[in-house]
From Swiss-Prot:
Domain of life: Eukaryota
Gene name, Swiss-Prot/TrEMBL: fsqC
Inducers of expression: Expression is positively regulated by the fumisoquins biosynthesis specific transcription factor fsqA.
EC category: transferase
Protein name: N-methyltransferase fsqC
Length: 366
């Protein structure tokens, strides 16, 4: 990474020191106007139970990746972001740092910016700071599945962009991607909506599912800004996704599954982490692997595992540029802008390591 690009680690971002600093008496106003709408409410656990059962019944067994993203899981994922082996974080930050003015050029004053899977919002702060420096009035909506982590991130943002002086209006949605798409259909807003999906998160889904998600969001009339990873160095990918921090993150999903099920069906001591590359899907896959023969009893159902059998936890696609174009076209979208990471030292092929794309609905598609 270029020496003039700030490292992503740590909060607040480097520019935040110049932000407005309210005194203690204004703390109520600073946080009082924060709106967080919970679209999941009390149905979260109940909705995950059938997904867990269905995944264990399947021939290709898997658990919902949503199990990874509770408050503890997000904390463990932040440790991954700080790991030197996890190349994505600083590479994406460098790309955003170098191209942020071009990336936000299509966002006009009065527009709505919705971030999917907002996480800790460090990158968000850079983007909002740039929009504010351009004197644009923006309605920013952060969407994430964990309410506690979402509120924490929003308060960090509001400390930098206080409602009393900032041109950025901040709001939160506790929602899955499906919840968010449905909410956007019901709430089209008065201006254009740009959806921001960073961190290679779209690539947690196989290409056909990724296309369906893009289609569902484009159908709301929004455009998308996607950040994706095109690394083709399998050794580099393994170091990034199979280290100790990743293993803790993935295995935490079993603890969360027990919480959701209200049982101790998954004894973490009986499972190990396994990572491998799936060449057919251009994806790295993480699994829970049985350390011995196991019998799981969940409700009235019994699931038998032989030693070494696996349950898939999460995937991460590493798609070259032509594959990204195909995925977007399958969704009825057209990639109109590319911002590429210029560092070609990553990967055993000449595929560039990372890029952001702006996707609009194809005017000639059905």
């Amino acid at each position: 990474m270029s020496s003039n690009v700030q490292d992503i680690r740590g909060w607040p971002p480097p520019f935040a020191n110049a932000a407005y600093q309210p005194d203690a008496s204004s703390r109520r106003a600073r946080y009082g106007g924060l709106q967080v709408h919970n679209l999941r409410q009390a149905t979260t656990a109940n909705s995950l139970v059938p997904s867990i059962i269905q995944g264990l019944r399947a021939e290709d067994r898997e658990l919902p990746s949503l199990l990874l993203w509770d408050d503890q899981g997000l904390s463990l994922f932040n440790a991954i972001l700080d790991s030197p082996e996890y190349y994505l974080a600083n590479k994406e930050w460098a790309l955003l740092h170098n191209e942020v003015h071009n990336i936000v050029a299509s966002i006009s004053s009065g527009d709505r910016l919705v971030e999917l899977g907002a996480g800790n919002m460090k990158k968000t702060a850079l983007i909002l700071h740039t929009l504010q420096s351009q004197r644009k009035y923006i309605h920013y909506i952060a969407c994430d599945v964990d309410r506690v982590a979402l509120q924490r991130g929003l308060r960090n943002l509001q400390a930098i962009f206080p409602a009393s002086t900032s041109s950025i209006k901040i709001q939160g949605l506790v929602a899955t991607y499906e919840d968010c798409a449905a909410w956007l259909q019901r709430n089209p807003g008065s201006g254009h909506t740009s959806l921001m999906w960073l961190g290679n998160s779209l690539a947690n889904f196989p290409p056909p599912e990724a296309s369906e998600y893009i289609r569902s969001f484009l159908s709301t009339g929004a455009s998308l800004i996607l950040a994706l990873d095109g690394c083709q160095d399998h050794e580099q990918i393994a170091r990034a996704y199979e280290g100790p921090s990743n293993q803790k993150f993935v295995l935490n999903g079993l603890r969360h599954a027990n919480d959701v099920l209200g049982t101790d069906a998954f004894d973490v001591r009986n499972w190990s982490f396994l990572g491998r590359w799936n060449p057919e899907l251009w994806m790295h896959e993480s699994f829970y692997a049985a350390k011995r023969d196991l019998t799981l009893k969940i409700g009235r159902e019994t699931f038998v595992f032989r030693k070494g059998e696996t349950i898939r936890s999460i995937r991460s696609g590493k798609w070259p540029k032509p594959k990204v174009v195909d995925i977007c076209r399958e969704a009825g979208g057209d990639v109109v802008d590319w911002w590429m990471n210029p560092d070609e030292s990553y990967g055993k092929s000449t595929t560039l390591m990372g890029y952001l794309a702006r996707v609009l609905i194809d005017s000639v598609s059905d």
